[in-house]
Amino acid sequence: MKTILRGINVGLWIVHINAKTGEGELNTDETMRKLLGVADDITPGECFKHWQSNLDKEYRSAVDNMIHEMAESDTVIQVEYPWHHPQGDTVTVRCCGRCVEENDEVIVFEGFHRVISDF
């Protein structure tokens, strides 16, 4: 299965957001790190900041709404947005995920990331 996902450039992720501070950690598979253009040894906190800092500013609210909707519902939520790749390209991303845990300390989301502008 991993070979199939890697072959079609689908990156998997798990995000942990501290419910008190709002700080996030982005845990990724190898394909996701490749899509983000980051090294394998990046920390989850650095990875989250990297992803967040390269979001297109005009679409930040759409992504924030997706995160809020995932936290509030028990359904899978999807959003498409431009993302500024470190190699200089702006790519269109389809992100799909769901909330898998929420308590007083942490909110956990899981999902996938796919660059769709390369079709």
Where are these regions (language model features)?
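Residue-level signal for short segments within beta-strands and strand-turn junctions
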Residues: 14-17, 85, 115
